[in-house]
A protein has these predicted regions:
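Acidic/His- and Gly-rich active-site-bordering loop/insert found
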Residues: 1-13, 30-35
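Conserved Rossmann-like nucleotide-binding pocket used by diverse enzymes
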Residues: 9, 72, 147
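Acidic/histidine-rich catalytic neighborhood of metal-dependent amide-processing enzymes
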Residues: 16-86, 90
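Metal-dependent amide/peptide-bond hydrolase catalytic core
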Residues: 92-212
């Protein structure tokens, strides 16, 4: 919270609290007009940490209200009206290897090396999506993006790492098939990464979980 004179400026006043205030201020005017089609306000929470509130909200709307014909989202978007937004998916991929001493790599399965192959493939997928971009698209950038945000693994420099965790995500164009992109990654892991790990031990492998 920042105070300047008689005004207090908390985080999120433009994105999204300003739009909430604007909509509620217009509610009396909407009521006076006796609209034939109702307008519903849907307020959620915790968008930045995985859209935690919206899941229950969508379930409640589906069960208790007619499906909406249109949705107005109060994102600031630099104060410009836009006709759509990219979707978002986030994932956690955990590679389980077989630990051992670095002097005997043939006796273990290196989780970080396997994770590195997955990271490189994510970059390959991103390249394909970028090369297929429509230059006339209103989106910036005009293609589905893949973000590799966090990687963690290993215990010591002389130990074959047993675990490697990769956190990655996608911002998907409305015209793209998110399931197909996700499936491409899962297929690569199943066909190109896991067999090498399981050749050392059946307990090694890769698990990818969608986190939102």
């Amino acid at each position: 919270l920042r105070a300047k004179g008689l005004k207090n400026r908390p985080i999120g006043t433009a994105d999204m609290k300003g739009f909430i205030a604007l909509g509620l201020a217009l509610a009396p005017e909407m009521k006076r007009r006796n609209l034939k089609t109702p307008i519903h306000f849907a307020l959620s929470y915790d968008e930045e940490v995985g859209c935690l509130g919206v899941r229950g909200l969508i379930k409640d709307v589906v069960e208790n209200l007619p499906l909406p014909r249109a949705v107005i989202v109060g994102e600031p978007t630099s104060m410009q009206i836009i006709g759509g937004n990219k979707g978002s998916r986030n994932y956690r991929t955990v590679v389980t290897g077989i630990p051992g001493h670095s002097s005997e790599p043939h006796r273990g399965a290196n989780a970080i090396m396997a994770g590195g192959r997955i990271c490189a493939f994510l970059e390959d997928v991103q390249t394909d999506l970028r090369e297929a971009a429509d230059p006339k698209s209103d989106f910036d950038p005009p293609y589905t993006t893949i973000d590799l945000g966090l990687i963690d693994g290993g215990t010591a420099g002389n130990i074959i790492p047993e675990f490697c965790t990769i956190r990655w995500g996608m911002r998907i164009l409305p015209s793209d098939d998110a399931d197909a992109i996700e499936g491409r990654v899962r297929t690569f892991i199943a066909e190109e990464v896991e067999p090498r790990l399981k050749a050392v031990s059946s307990s090694a492998g890769v698990e990818t979980t969608r986190t939102n």
